[in-house]
């Protein structure tokens, strides 16, 4: 739930599978990164999960980074796809900075001028399941980039074992318990956010995503979901 779009578990699972299947159809390799850039939304979260289900590695990029830094992160990650929203797409286009040759998919709506398809049009047909990829504890789960305040942002690779450990801690903390919602008010490129998000999803919880932090809205959501 991001305030504009709400999905049940069944709906989310079907969409994640369709996105993952299309990533595989377009050649996503085991452990290969999938770059994601944009405001935190339900669809952003779906792409993040689909990259992992497809056997790849999610690479959420910092929205506050400069175009030059973003281009460097995309190249460093080794991604073949960039999932992006219109706000960030316009910023990058206006900057004139050359970007790596990635397949662009729009998270929020199609961009015919750039030839970038809309996520829900691009993904595989309903009912198409991704091929199961055998992964181990040391295989990459996601790449988190440093802030870059002292230079080019550095990629920090988290293994699947590391995230599994966080999921186990989340279970002990009650994340995913019946009737409990997790309110996430920080961006999904933040490791703090992701640690709580993946644990919530691992145990069938409800994740409530804030596109941008707003104190009054946060209090309203906290009252609504407590």
Spell out what each predicted region is.
Residues 13-18, 137, 156-177, 185, ...:
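Conserved structural elements of the adenylate-forming
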Residues 164-181, 189-226:
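Conserved AMP-binding/adenylation subdomain of ANL enzymes
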Residues 3-5, 20-68, 187:
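Conserved AMP-binding/adenylate-forming
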Residues 81, 87-137:
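ANL superfamily adenylate-forming
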Residues 126-145, 152, 175-181:
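Conserved pre-ATP/AMP-binding loop-to-beta segment of ANL
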Residues 67-68, 75, 95-114, 202-206, ...:
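Conserved adenylate-forming
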